[in-house]
Structure formats: C-alpha cells, structure tokens
Amino acid sequence: MEAAVAPGRDAPAPAASQPSGCGKHNSPERKVYMDYNATTPLEPEVIQAMTKAMWEAWGNPSSPYSAGRKAKDIINAARESLAKMIGGKPQDIIFTSGGTESNNLVIHSVVKHFHANQTSKGHTGGHHSPVKGAKPHFITSSVEHDSIRLPLEHLVEEQVAAVTFVPVSKVSGQAEVDDILAAVRPTTRLVTIMLANNETGIVMPVPEISQRIKALNQERVAAGLPPILVHTDAAQALGKQRVDVEDLGVDFLTIVGHKFYGPRIGALYIRGLGEFTPLYPMLFGGGQERNFRPGTENTPMIAGLGKAAELVTQNCEAYEAHMRDVRDYLEERLEAEFGQKRIHLNSQFPGTQRLPNTCNFSIRGPRLQGHVVLAQCRVLMASVGAACHSDHGDQPSPVLLSYGVPFDVARNALRLSVGRSTTRAEVDLVVQDLKQAVAQLEDQA
C-alpha cells in the first residue's frame, strides 16, 4: 500500500512531491503530485500563522479582552492582505467558507436586489413600473464551475430566474465578448464569467467584458434600466498570475484559499460594498462581517488565508515564471516522447492566454482513456479534470466537448497542473511513468 505525504516547500528535494510508502518489493516508490488545480498544500508560513492564532488568538473576536482583541487584529490584518493581493479596499472584503459560498452569495444577492427594486418601483409607480412575474436574467458561460452552474440551473427550475449559458468559442476557447453582449436583455442583472477555467487554464476576457458592460450601463441608466453587475470567480487565477480588481473592472470577485497554498476558506470582494454594489446575507445571526456573513469568525483559518495572500503579493511574478517554465517543459517532453501526432494539447488556442501551470492533453489511442492511464501510473498523482467531476467514469469532460475537442480525444484527457516547487526532474519522472503506463495497456490489448 502506498501513501503520499502532502507536498510542502521546505521538505527535502523537491518538497512539492515528496513520496512515502511502499511500492513493489516493499521499496519506497516516489510519487509526483501534479494536481495543483484541485488543491494545494499549505505553505509552512501559513501553517505557522494558523498555529500562532490557535495559541494566542483563541478569544472571540467580538470580546473586549486581550485574546479577543488579538483575534480581531488578526482578522483585520488578513482582510488588508487580501485586499492588497487583488488591488481592492479592505472594507470591500467579506470572509466566507469558500468559493462555493462566495459564488452562491453573489447569485442570491442579485436575485434579492432585483425583487427589492421591483417592490420599490411598485410602490412609487412611474414609467418603469415592474412587470408582473418578471425574473432577473443572468448571463454566464457554458464552462463555469458547478458552484455557478448548479445554483443558476436551480433558479431556472424554480422559475426564479432566467439564465443564458453562452457557449465558448471553438476558435479562441473563450466566452466571446460579443456573444455575451448579444445575450443582454432589459432584465439582465448579472454577468458571471470565471477568470480562468479550472480544466483547461484558458483565461477569459473579463476586462473587456467589464468595459463593454460599463459602457452599456450608461445607456441603460439613461433609459431608466438598472445597471448590470459583473462577477468573476478568480479561484484558479489567484497565485498563478496577477489579479487586480481595478484592471478587471468587476463588481464581485471570488477568492478561494486552498488554490493558492492557503486553508480551505474563502472570501468575496464586493466593489463599494453596500454603497455601489448590493449584498444580501444568506444567513442571519450574530452580526459578524457587518451582518453580511454572520457567525463567529474562524480566526486561525482567516490568519492562514491572510498569510497566503501576503505570499502571493510578494512572490506572484516568480511563481508564475517558474510554473510556466515547468509546464512548457512538460508539454515539450510529452511531444518528444510520444510524438506530436499522438499528443493532443486540448487547451492551446492561438492568441489565447492560459494559466502558466495547466496542461490538459490526451494521448491518442483506443484503450487509453484518461482514468485508465492514471490507474496504471506508479508515480503520477493527477486527475482527468475537475475534482468535483471525478465520479464521471470514462465519460469525457463536458467542458472539453464545449471547446470542440472530439469525443474520443476528450475521453483520453489528463489534466496535469504544476506547482510552485515542481521541477523539471519531476516532469521527466512523470513522462516516463506515462510511457510505461501506456506500454502496459497496449501490451494487455
């Protein structure tokens, strides 16, 4: 039986993929972790910050004595670190349990705000009085994370909202700006487009979308229509490339700690919270987080999230350069060992930016489905796609099919995502491991 130690940057050479356990003939067999888009290990500095908070800041942050004040100070400092990481203001950050809650909170708030406005108009009358049975309209892409897609589908089923799922272009791999603008209706209230796709690494044109929506909003306001808000789920992009809310021009941005070597909590950025951008709580209780997200704060986790954000602010350019170098080397080695005709790089679109760490590829062959190949690997720890879709068997990823990847090719897909301390030597081990796995499967046939 084999066991793998969680990767960490200060472990022996290289920390990110240090194995343990027993392999054939009871000898240790090295494991290489390449599933950093699924989750990342905690940085040692993050663990230290969390541990210190557990020892020293155990008090209730709402309490006036020293342990409580210490907890409150840690929370405020973490809020500032998150704001600095994304170029926002601390008062525009709300802590949540993670990305799923943040995304649901945005959708919930837009629905509540729509109906609050409808009620207000009904009381005041006027030219733009509400239409009976009117529903808010959402625009999103066909490749969003389930924490966006499923809540929206649920609202449609409940006849609470209308949703347009804009297909991604098979030429660029992106949700095209013109297609998004073409979907706008008078009742449109939110455009939500992920910043980078978790399976392919494709970066979406969020700044251009925001610019076009902002221009459109001027026309809408002049016509007496409410403005359209823009949300992006930045879970996969943070820690891999620079993310700045001013450059993006968004009203909401989702932050997920465990994607950038932090703990499994999250946060939500809301531009001009309560003043320019509405937010409605899903929970009601003690009034924490200015009543927007009540519940006694999880100080140690928030401390860790703040430290992880601080490390990203300090080192993001170096992280990005290293991951890009290793990812590019991985793709070179795959094509060199298997041949360019046999390797299909599923997320390379001319002129389209990708995350620096993500390689989604297929090895062509009739019996080389992704999950079958991974089962034969002795070294590689990776996935065929999103971790939340790991129970789909040999069915190809709907995301890859949306990108125009042929069915048989998509069924063979593997998603390898490298981390901050993944090395070229580990890439060599992984490529050789894939070669032996493929050879074994072909021999069995």
Swiss-Prot record:
Its EC number is 4.4.1.16. Catalyzes the decomposition of L-selenocysteine to L-alanine and elemental selenium. It comes from the Eukaryota. Homodimer. Belongs to the class-V pyridoxal-phosphate-dependent aminotransferase family. The lineage of its organism: Eukaryota, Metazoa, Chordata, Craniata, Vertebrata. Induction: Up-regulated in acute glomerulonephritis. Regulated by JUN/AP-1. This is Selenocysteine lyase. InterPro entries: Aminotrans_V_dom (IPR000192), Cysteine_dSase (IPR016454), PyrdxlP-dep_Trfase (IPR015424), PyrdxlP-dep_Trfase_major (IPR015421), PyrdxlP-dep_Trfase_small (IPR015422). One of its GO terms (biological process) is amino acid metabolic process. The gene is SCLY. Gene3D superfamilies: 1.10.260.50, Aspartate Aminotransferase, domain 1, Type I PLP-dependent aspartate aminotransferase-like (Major domain). The active site is at residue 388. Pfam families: Aminotran_5 (PF00266). It is found in: Cytoplasm, Cytosol. Keywords: Acetylation, Cytoplasm, Lyase, Phosphoprotein, Pyridoxal phosphate, Transferase. Residues 1-28 are annotated as: Disordered. GO terms for cellular component: catalytic complex; cytosol; Golgi apparatus. The modification N-acetylmethionine is found at residue 1. Its cofactor is pyridoxal 5'-phosphate. It comes from Homo sapiens (Human). It catalyses: L-selenocysteine + AH2 = hydrogenselenide + L-alanine + A + H(+). One of its GO terms (molecular function) is protein homodimerization activity. The modification Phosphoserine is found at residue 129. The modification N6-(pyridoxal phosphate)lysine is found at residue 259.
